[in-house]
UniProtKB/Swiss-Prot annotation:
The protein's name: Dynamin
Disruption phenotype: RNAi-mediated knockdown causes abnormal accumulation of apoptotic cell corpses in early phagosomes in gonads.
A biological process from GO: locomotion
Domain PH: 519-624
Assembly behavior: May be a component of a complex composed of rab-5 (in GDP-bound form), dyn-1 and vps-34. Interacts with tax-6.
Gene name of this polypeptide: dyn-1
Length: 830
């Protein structure tokens, strides 16, 4: 280790300490820490590679999925040999069989004993004089078939877990593949290629080289000539199952691995660049350089995270949950803010707070007053036939046995009072709708106090209870308004038509229908949802005018599809299909004739119920009224009554009809005007005044204000989590600041390139050996240091040399020469 730059070697422990800073504080790392993730299929040899690094058997083994949680393995060079788990900090494991047992127990504690998996990692630190500083993440092996209680999508779950690690640009990928399988079908390389298509972050590891079929070898792969990776491949030979069962010593296995490569004719020329020891050195160097490159970005990310949290942390820094003064101040602030939020919701928001997605608060109440309430009133009107029949009965019953010569005004009063009484139901329904909407506003504004759930619940209870009291008062007052209209029939009203004008209209047969002119009432998107009309629901642009309904392909209104005259058209609600989110209504002719081609009704709908109500209110303005539910009567009796009316009675019926229509317009106009005013004054405004003047007093009357200001467990956890994250970031920045920044300023060694270039000018450039003869086999490498010896690690090999042809020896970390000049076996400085 004397040839290594100690400042650079400190980088791996720095990242380990940063990782621990987050883990110890119970905070997940939301930053992309530099690391190496070990990826491979089941039985690819991942565990054996890691055990060879440590020199001990310490990982669980068995059939199926053995690694069921990510294992963050931190190898730390130390004179003593022991292991330590982060979840058992301070407890040293010197028996590595106990380490294996602890991994199994900790895995089962989270995932259960039936092969379940979890993304929550286990942190294990191994101290040993036989390891280089290195951090790896052992991930579950890729599998195809679920076992035990594993879900059917276990393959996708493992794949997603692996991708969460290797998707990060700061993560190097150690792709472990058995050499006795087809590399083209390697799960590890395939997954690595998805996230690293250029092979810049992937290091290939070939295992089971000793198990390849006779006459085959992996020379071209190890020389990076097939499936090239910028960081190349390293071959290793692990213990077989027989060796593991026989408890073969790992040191003996490493010696056997070395002998295998030296003696094998296909690998002996590159034996110095194969094996577990070389792989460990390579990973140490590449991870060190990788950390060096990413550390400034990590520092910036930590600083940004801290700056984003500073405002909230400053609020929490001196936080005392049981301080009475703080509780009183918080209570006053919460109530004041609640009142302001209610007022803003009802009266309207500022430009900064206005919602652009949907109507809310006061806007919804406004729509109830001016769209929904008029629609409910019109729904209560009876149709012409029903009204004329009632007028006829009233006139006959008033005349009795006598033959009436004049139109009786008592018939007008009886019919008008019946119609006025019917206005009470929609008026009270308007109150219910507004109260429900106001309750929603109160609930939404109270949700801002979720930090104090008892205060929120108590405040909401007090305000809603008061609002319900005001609701009853409002309903009584609205009932009185209707009673006022019933108490006195003001036939001298300036807008009332009078008997003389009514009789004139009756004699002329004029229609009482108001002429709106050919004006546009509403435009918007609706779906034509007749199943047989179009295939599925299709949105069209509809334009409603006072006498017709047209629809177009789009809102440019260039391509008109159809225009439907509204004369005689009725409207009815229809239910949507099963699991349908569409609200629908239909247009039809009461006499049953087709409304469009062969279809007797036109079904229109959209997903928003409020939009449907607005459309139905617009149709009312155009004179399209809802379908009435009539009692079934005997047709013969109805025909007899219809044919028995004489011309004089018919004129009297028409006169009363015109009088009732004129008077009801006056009353309806009054009701439409007074009911919203009564609701606003008696409910909305009075509730607002109550909250400003009396709400705080009612809260103090509840008794224990300390209990009201008890913080929710969720909020406490949120605060603690933020403080943990803040302190973890602060600690991580402190750790990073200890790194010698001049070391970080050095130029890192170059990545492997696809061609060979001699070193730049220097005191002693490295000579380029002659390329191997085409198709021939290179002679065995001479001893290290002799003529023709391979360049030391960190120097580029010739194209024909092992690891050449697009590869390179793994780069060394930069060094500073000591007083005596460059260390041995190192290239002179550039």
């Amino acid at each position: 280790m004397s040839w290594q730059n100690q400042g650079m070697q400190a980088l791996i422990p720095v990242i380990n300490r940063v990782q621990d800073a987050f883990s110890q504080l119970g905070t997940s790392v939301s930053f992309e820490l530099p690391q190496i993730a070990v990826v491979g299929g089941q039985s690819a040899g991942k565990s054996s590679v890691l055990e060879n690094f440590v020199g001990k058997d310490f990982l669980p083994r068995g059939s199926g999925i053995v690694t069921r949680r990510p294992l963050i393995l931190q190898l730390i060079q130390d004179r003593n040999e022991y292991a330590e788990f982060l979840h058992k900090k301070g407890h040293r494991f010197v028996d590595f069989d106990a380490v294996r047992k602890e991994i199994e127990d900790e895995t089962d504690r989270v995932t259960g004993q039936n092969k379940g998996i979890s993304p929550h990692p286990i942190n294990l630190r191994v101290f040993s004089p036989n390891v280089l500083n290195l951090t790896l993440i052992d991930l579950p092996g890729l599998t195809k078939v679920p076992v035990g209680d594993q879900p059917a999508d276990i393959e996708q779950q493992i794949r997603d877990m692996i991708l969460t690690f290797i998707n990060r640009e700061t993560c190097l990928i150690l792709a472990v593949t058995p050499a006795n399988s087809d590399l083209a079908t390697s799960d590890a390389l395939k997954l690595a290629k998805e996230v690293d298509p250029q092979g810049l972050r992937t290091i290939g590891v070939l295992t089971k080289l000793d198990l390849m079929d006779e006459g085959t070898d992996a020379r071209e792969i190890l020389e990076n000539k097939l499936f090239t990776l910028r960081r190349g491949y390293v071959g290793v030979v692990n213990r077989g199952q027989k060796d593991i069962v026989g408890r073969k010593d790992i040191r003996a296995a490493l010696d056997a691995e070395r002998k295998f490569f030296i003696s094998h004719p296909s690998y002996r020329h590159m034996a110095d660049r194969l094996g577990t020891s070389y792989l460990q050195h390579t990973l140490n160097q590449q991870l060190t350089n990788h950390i060096r490159d990413t550390l400034p970005t990590l520092r910036d990310s930590l600083q940004k995270k801290m700056f984003a949290m500073e405002k909230d942390v400053a609020e929490y820094k001196n936080y005392q949950p049981n301080d009475p003064g703080r509780k009183t101040k918080a209570l006053l602030q919460m109530v004041t803010q609640f009142n302001a939020d209610i007022e803003r919701s009802i009266e309207g928001s500022s430009a900064k707070l206005v919602s652009t997605n949907e109507l809310s608060g006061g806007a919804r109440i406004n729509r109830l007053f001016h769209e929904r309430f008029p629609f409910e009133i019109v729904k209560m009107e009876i149709d012409e036939k029903e009204m004329r029949k009632e007028i006829q009965y009233a006139i006959r019953n008033i005349h009795g046995i006598r033959v009436g010569l004049f139109t009786p005004d008592m018939a007008f009063e009886a019919i008008a009072k019946k119609q006025i009484t019917r206005l009470k139901e929609p008026s009270l329904k308007c109150v219910d709708l507004v109260v429900n909407e106001l309750a929603n506003v109160i609930r939404q504004c109270a949700d801002t106090m979720a930090r104090y759930p008892r205060l929120r619940d108590e405040l909401e209870r007090i305000v809603v209870s008061h609002m319900r009291e005001r609701e009853q008062i409002a309903k009584q007052q609205i009932g009185l308004i209707v009673d006022y209209e019933l108490a006195y029939m003001n036939t001298n009203h300036e807008d009332f038509i009078g008997f003389s004008n009514a009789e004139a209209k009756a004699s002329q047969g004029q229609s009482a229908k108001k002429n709106l002119g050919n004006q546009v009432i509403r435009k918007g998107w609706l779906s034509l949802s007749n199943v047989s009309f179009v295939r599925g629901s299709k949105d069209n642009w509809f334009v409603l005018m006072s006498d017709s309904l047209s629809w177009y392909k789009d809102d440019e209104e260039k391509e008109k599809k159809y225009m439907l005259p509204l004369d005689g058209v009725k409207l009815k609600d229809i239910e949507g299909g099963f699991m349908s989110r569409n609200h629908k209504f239909a247009l039809f002719y009461p006499d049953g004739k087709n409304i469009y081609k062969d279809y007797k009704q036109l079904e229109l709908g959209c997903t928003n119920l409020d939009e449907i109500d607005a459309w139905k209110a617009s149709f009312l303005r155009a004179g399209v009224y809802p379908e009435k539910q009539k009692a079934q009567e005997d047709e013969s009796q109805q025909e007899m009554e219809d044919t028995s009316i004489d011309p004089q009675l018919e004129r009297q019926v028409e006169t009363i009809r015109n009088l009732v229509d004129s008077y009801m317009r006056i009353i309806t106009k009054t009701i439409k005007d007074l009911v919203p005013k009564a609701v606003m004054h008696l409910i909305v405004n009075q509730t607002g005044e109550f909250m400003k003047d009396e709400l705080l007093a009612h809260l103090y009357q509840c008794g224990d204000t300390d209990a009201l200001m008890e913080e929710s467990q969720i909020e406490a956890q949120k605060r603690e989590e933020m403080l943990r994250m803040y302190h973890a970031c602060k600690e991580a920045l402190r750790i990073i600041s200890e790194v010698n920044m001049s070391t970080l300023g050095d130029q890192p060694p170059p990545l492997p390139m696809s061609d060979y270039r001699p070193h730049p000018s220097g005191p002693s450039p490295v000579p380029r050996p002659a390329p191997a003869p085409p198709g021939g086999r290179q002679a065995p490498m001479p001893p290290r240091g002799g003529p023709g010896a391979p360049p030391p690690p960190g120097m580029r090999p010739p194209p024909g040399a092992p690891g050449g042809g697009g590869g390179m020896y793994p780069p060394l970390i930069p060094t500073r020469p000591g007083p005596g000049g460059p260390p041995p076996n190192m290239a002179p400085p550039r």
